[in-house]
């Protein structure tokens, strides 16, 4: 049977593969023309070659790397079956990853929405909170006046490796006391929220996975400024004292960037909350 020859443009139309892709496949020895005119360098393909593009297109569609495509071209049916089984496993692994990532983004949005729906800033309110998973470490002499972004670097690095998603908030805990000055305050722990429910086993001895418990909290949120920090804490303390509420936890302080623009002055939202008996 006489073979029909097609130019690269004709193969592009017949197989629905771009000319650019066909040239690249030739370059990497994935799909080479049957004949190249030595005078014009035009590529020509035989009719029987077109079937090989079916496998290449199918493997490209499922995201198979080019080097793996080359290997697949040499496989017999039983071997190709095993190859597809492995591709299926890899796809399921990717789907599991994407599903977990979707849940993480959903949780981030849920927390952001809650923060955007707070009552008026600078006013104490009571809120029923869900449990929040955190990773924390002892503060070791850190307090409101000397805490730095760098103080959280170790926690953030661990969260990035465990969650794969950089957290946009961090916090601290301190005991509930009738403070009269910010100089009296020292943090017990610094922490950052954990965004996934994955089992985390490789923490260092100075770190601890724990939770901010589910329950009812007296809260105050405000845009940070040095002069407003202690005034807002005093509002929270006074609110609890005036209503004779029973405190059952430390104060949780959460700091959230309002924006990330390098062209603007840094701005932060501070949330202070303490669990109260229901």
Swiss-Prot record:
Which keywords has UniProt assigned to this entry?
Answer: Activator, DNA-binding, Transcription, Transcription regulation
Q: Please verify whether the record's keywords include Cell division.
A: no
> How is this protein organized at the quaternary level?
Binds DNA as a homodimer.
Keyword hit for Transcription: yes
Q: Give the matching CDD domains.
A: HTH_BmrR
Checking Gene3D superfamilies in the record gives:
1.10.1660.10, Regulatory factor, effector binding domain (3.20.80.10), Single helix bin (1.20.5.490)
**Annotated region of DNA binding:** 8-27
Q: Where is the HTH merR-type domain?
A: 5-75
Provide a Gene Ontology MF annotation, just one.
DNA binding
Q: What does this protein do?
A: Activates transcription of the bmr gene in response to structurally dissimilar drugs. Binds rhodamine as an inducer.
Q: Which cysteines are joined by disulfide bonds?
A: none
Q: Name one GO biological process term.
A: regulation of DNA-templated transcription
Q: Which PANTHER family match?
A: CHROMOSOME-ANCHORING PROTEIN RACA, REDOX-CYCLING DRUG-SENSING TRANSCRIPTIONAL ACTIVATOR SOXR
Q: Which organism is it from?
A: Bacillus subtilis (strain 168)
- Name-wise, this protein is Multidrug-efflux transporter 1 regulator
Q: Which domain of life is it from?
A: Bacteria
């Amino acid at each position: 049977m006489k073979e029909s020859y097609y130019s690269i443009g004709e193969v592009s139309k017949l197989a629905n593969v771009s000319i650019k892709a066909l040239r690249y496949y030739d370059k990497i020895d994935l799909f080479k023309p049957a004949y190249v005119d030595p005078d014009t360098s035009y590529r020509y393909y035989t009719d029987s070659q077109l079937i090989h593009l079916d496998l290449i297109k199918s493997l490209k569609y499922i995201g198979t790397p080019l080097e793996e495509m080359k290997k697949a071209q040499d496989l017999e049916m039983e071997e190709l079956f095993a190859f597809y089984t492995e591709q299926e496993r890899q796809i399921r692994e990717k789907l599991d990853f994407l599903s977990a990532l979707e849940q993480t983004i959903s949780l981030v949005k849920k927390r952001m929405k809650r923060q955007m729906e707070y009552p008026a800033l600078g006013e104490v309110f009571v809120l029923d909170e869900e449990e929040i998973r955190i990773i924390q470490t002892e503060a070791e002499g850190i307090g409101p006046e000397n805490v730095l972004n760098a103080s959280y670097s170790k926690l953030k690095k661990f969260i990035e490796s465990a969650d794969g998603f950089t957290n946009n908030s961090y916090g601290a805990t301190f005991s509930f006391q009738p403070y009269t000055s910010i100089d009296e305050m020292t943090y017990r722990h610094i922490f950052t929220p954990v965004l996934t429910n994955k089992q985390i086993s490789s923490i260092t001895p100075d770190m601890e996975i724990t939770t901010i418990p589910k329950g009812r909290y007296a809260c105050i949120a405000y845009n940070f400024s040095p002069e407003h920090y202690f005034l807002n804490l005093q509002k929270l303390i006074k609110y609890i004292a005036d209503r004779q509420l029973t405190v059952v936890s430390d104060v949780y302080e959460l700091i959230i960037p309002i924006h990330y623009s390098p062209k603007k002055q840094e701005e932060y939202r501070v949330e202070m909350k303490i669990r109260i008996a229901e």
